[in-house]
Amino acid sequence: MVTEWKNFFKGCCMQLLNVGFGNTVMVGRVVAVVNTGSSPARKIREIAKKNGKLIDVTEGRRTRSMLVMDSNHVVLSSVQSDTISQRLQAMRIDLQLGECREQGKKVYNENE
């Protein structure tokens, strides 16, 4: 079973984003970070709840942001949407730098 997971993630950079209280989501699967104050956000929340795709990680606190995932799941978080956006941006920059480093290693190894 472990080998299957290793093969599944082989070549894939799995970065996790903290969405509060020790809960994480995969960075590559986040489609949107939505502020909960708008009417469309409430509609998204209702639809996700109706379809059984709503994940609440607020632990009873006020919902401050919603993460829409590529699987149509909606994650409710008590962390501000601006904070989550900043964390996402920082992680994506790190990922791009890592890819540049990997490409540099490949070029360096080919020249040897």
UniProtKB/Swiss-Prot annotation:
Family membership noted in the UniProt record: Belongs to the RemA family.
Native organism: Desulfotalea psychrophila (strain LSv54 / DSM 12343)
Name used for this protein in its record: Putative regulatory protein DP2861
Pfam families associated with the record: RemA-like (PF04025)
NCBIfam families (UniProt xref): PRK04323.1
HAMAP family linked: RemA (MF_01503)
PANTHER family: REGULATORY PROTEIN SSL2874-RELATED, REGULATORY PROTEIN TM_1690-RELATED
